[in-house]
Amino acid sequence: MEKWYDKYLSIYGKTFDEIPDSVLDEIKNNLAEKQSPEPLVSIVVIAYNEECRLAACLWSLSELQTKYPIEILGVNNNSKDRTEEVYQRLGLPYFTELRQSPGFARQCGLENAKGKYHFCIDADTFYPAQYVDLMMTKLTKPNVSCVSSFWSFFPDENHSRFGLFLFEMIRDMFLFVQHFKRPELCVRGMVFAFNADYARKVAIRTDIRRGEDGSLALSLKPFGKITFLYNRKARPVTGYGTIGSQSLWQSFVQHVKIQGKGLSRIFYKKDHYEDSEDNLVKRE
């Protein structure tokens, strides 16, 4: 059965030169048509060495169906490959952040975005057409500061569709239970949107390697709730950056070991977290 993301997957992993000009022209024209001079929503892609994945992500964003005025921006986070050329070829407004980390890249995007509502986008991920509007049904509610969603992986020769179904079902059940007391731990950058006015009053952490999005969500709690959208039509599809070369079973066992150590946390709230040394960015 054909999936909504199959055509984006057809160029995913291909070098810049391997993508047909006709496809690149289509993406470029679609992106240009989406840009509003007075956006309510900013959709900001961060990319580090994503030459072989960025165009597929932008193709999906170019086909968003939304009733809101939007802008789509890019951040080139000190890439050493041809990521910048992809932005240029597709005519996407972008900014360069030489300080390398997701935190610095997210901060650069926030500083240059115009919209009241800010959507974080990862360059190795595909987004369904209704993603923005469905997320906005939550984000525009009173007393909400930010919203996150679930996500899926696309099947490949090493990850079967049935195996992914089981893996995601168990993961989603755990995240659902966890979100009642610790919603900030359920937030992932690829599926994160927030009120930009609130975010500019706090700080996106640039001193940690992972978890800057969850940390931002925690900082936004005084302004409103962290809420979640449970809708299959708003479920992005991504690659295996969070799993790496592991099999699903290996990843599952690793997650069980990690989450099992602090399982009691799902029963109480927390407003402050201590940093672990291995997650701190070393300053030269």
What is the meaning of each model-derived region?
Residues 118:
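Short aromatic/hydrophobic "clamp" motif used to bind/position activated sugar donors
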Residues 209-216:
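Acidic donor-binding loop at a coil-to-helix junction in glycosyltransferase catalytic cores
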Residues 149-155, 163-185:
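Short, flexible, basic/aromatic active-site loop/helix in glycosyltransferases
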